[in-house]
């Protein structure tokens, strides 16, 4: 089903970038920058805080961007993003079908990025804060407190169902 595929792709993109829903919905080509080594970055002010995020685009996220590069419904934006309410409703549907008993939401992806992608792999608290657009590490420390290997196991279940 096309809508389920799009919701999955946006969710996975957020897991690999840490972008909040409002920021991924607003993501446009102007936010993509190549550095002097040819590496792709997302450079964008967070909608919520207006703080600049600098996020390296990992291969999984890059492949999702490539997939939607010429999709008509993305005109002016990089991804086909439904409303937050619809996204969360579809994520609940996906979780039910996959037998996931965790409440999946667009914000779950941001937490997964901070914990399973970054902190669990040794990225410093300061760098995670910068990528998430936090003013300092006090908010980021909240993510570290919820670091739990069960998040990774749950995401593996999602991946095997999608």
Give the positions of each predicted feature.
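Alpha-helix N-cap/helix-start motif at helix boundaries, enriched for small hydrophobics
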Residues: 10, 22-27, 128
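Catalytic-site neighborhood detector that most strongly recognizes the C-terminal catalytic loop/helix
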Residues: 46-50, 62, 84, 132-157
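C-terminal secondary-structure termini that scaffold catalytic or DNA-interacting sites
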Residues: 71-73, 158-162
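C-terminal catalytic core of Y-nucleophile DNA break-rejoin enzymes
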Residues: 47-66, 72-93
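Short, polar N-cap/turn motifs at the start of nucleic acid-interacting alpha helices
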Residues: 31-38, 101-102, 122-142, 149, ...
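Short, basic (Lys/Arg/His-rich) helix/loop patches that form interaction surfaces
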Residues: 1-7, 70-77, 81, 89-130
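Basic, Lys/Arg- and aromatic-enriched nucleic-acid-binding interface segment
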Residues: 1-21
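Conserved tyrosine-mediated DNA breakage-rejoining catalytic core shared by Y-recombinases
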Residues: 17, 26-66
């Amino acid at each position: 089903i096309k809508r389920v595929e799009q919701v999955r792709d946006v969710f996975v993109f957020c897991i690999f970038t840490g972008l909040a829903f409002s920021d991924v919905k607003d993501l446009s080509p102007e936010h993509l920058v190549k550095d002097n080594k040819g590496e792709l970055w997302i450079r964008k002010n967070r909608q919520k805080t207006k703080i600049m995020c600098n996020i390296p685009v990992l291969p999984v996220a890059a492949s999702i961007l490539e997939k939607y590069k010429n999709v008509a419904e993305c005109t002016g934006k990089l991804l086909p993003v439904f409303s937050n309410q619809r996204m969360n409703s579809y994520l609940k549907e996906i979780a039910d079908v996959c037998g996931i008993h965790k409440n999946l939401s667009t914000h779950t992806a941001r937490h997964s990025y901070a914990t399973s992608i970054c902190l669990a792999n040794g990225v410093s608290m300061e760098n995670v804060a910068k990528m998430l657009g936090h003013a300092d590490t006090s908010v980021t420390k909240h993510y570290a407190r919820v670091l739990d290997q069960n998040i990774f196991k749950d995401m593996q279940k999602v991946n095997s169902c999608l």
